[in-house]
Amino acid sequence: MMTNLFSVFDPSTTILNLSLNWLSTFLGLLIIPSTYWLMPNRFQIIWNNILLTLHKEFKTLLGPNGHNGSTLMFVSLFSLIMFNNFLGLFPYIFTSTSHLTLTLTLAFPLWLSFMLYGWICHTQHMFAHLVPQGTPPVLMPFMVCIETISNVIRPGTLAVRLTANMIAGHLLMTLLGNTGPMSTSYIILSLILITQIALLVLESAVAIIQSYVFAVLSTLYSSEVN
């Protein structure tokens, strides 16, 4: 067994004392530009259709008051997170989205920019959001406190949700991977292999779902300040 179960998440790849783990975050940028000067294949056509569908959905979520071009930011956010989630499933590639360093870096500036824009440009609208419609006057002070707290913890919940989902799946696969070499029965090895494949398929689905959830929630937070 491993001495430390969480050691799989340690950024330990270095050359000349330069950490190379976080470079995997930008590997997707090497794949995307080829679509601009090469004939599109079936995969690229499918990917373009996915991006177009996301663009239409995010545009609907932003509403008529959303700024033109805003969907590009959220589609790019979805692509970046999904690429890194999938790269983390490959052996010996650093899972950058399992660290709050990356997820908070994505969530906090987005939330802060939305808040600054909303409170500076739509102050009355932001104050109105603190008290839901139909709230009794007696409960208004409590609702203001509750809404303020729920608003402040949004970047934290976004970041922790993504990080926790990535860590949970990788820990399960690590535990199964370390159990296999100690087993001498072919039946147990076969069961572990089948379970590992099923977990890998499940983690692939989680990689897509979590990137979609992160992008959609960011879009919804943006639509509230318009």
UniProtKB/Swiss-Prot annotation:
**Matches recorded under InterPro entries:** ATP_synth_F0_asu (IPR000568), ATP_synth_F0_asu_AS (IPR023011), ATP_synth_F0_asu_bact/mt (IPR045083), F0_ATP_A_sf (IPR035908)
Q: Which GO terms describe its molecular function?
A: proton-transporting ATP synthase activity, rotational mechanism
Q: Which PROSITE patterns match?
A: ATPASE_A
Question: Transmembrane region positions?
Answer: 18-38, 74-94, 100-120, 162-182, 187-207
SUPFAM superfamilies from the xrefs?
Answer: F1F0 ATP synthase subunit A
Cellular compartment(s): Mitochondrion inner membrane
Which GO cellular component terms are attached?
Answer: mitochondrial inner membrane; proton-transporting ATP synthase complex
Any keyword Plastid? no
**Keywords of this entry:** ATP synthesis, CF(0), Hydrogen ion transport, Ion transport, Membrane, Mitochondrion, Mitochondrion inner membrane, Transmembrane, Transmembrane helix, Transport
**How does the record say this protein sits in the membrane?**
Multi-pass membrane protein
Q: Summarize the protein's role.
A: Mitochondrial membrane ATP synthase (F(1)F(0) ATP synthase or Complex V) produces ATP from ADP in the presence of a proton gradient across the membrane which is generated by electron transport complexes of the respiratory chain. F-type ATPases consist of two structural domains, F(1) - containing the extramembraneous catalytic core and F(0) - containing the membrane proton channel, linked together by a central stalk and a peripheral stalk. During catalysis, ATP synthesis in the catalytic domain of F(1) is coupled via a rotary mechanism of the central stalk subunits to proton translocation.
Summary of subunit composition and partner proteins: F-type ATPases have 2 components, CF(1) - the catalytic core - and CF(0) - the membrane proton channel. CF(1) has five subunits: alpha(3), beta(3), gamma(1), delta(1), epsilon(1). CF(0) has three main subunits: a, b and c.
NCBIfam families listed in its UniProt record: ATP_synt_6_or_A (TIGR01131)
Tell me its family.
Belongs to the ATPase A chain family.
The name this protein carries in UniProt is: ATP synthase subunit a
From which organism does this entry originate? Aedes aegypti (Yellowfever mosquito)
Instruction: Report which gene this protein is encoded by.
Output: mt:ATPase6
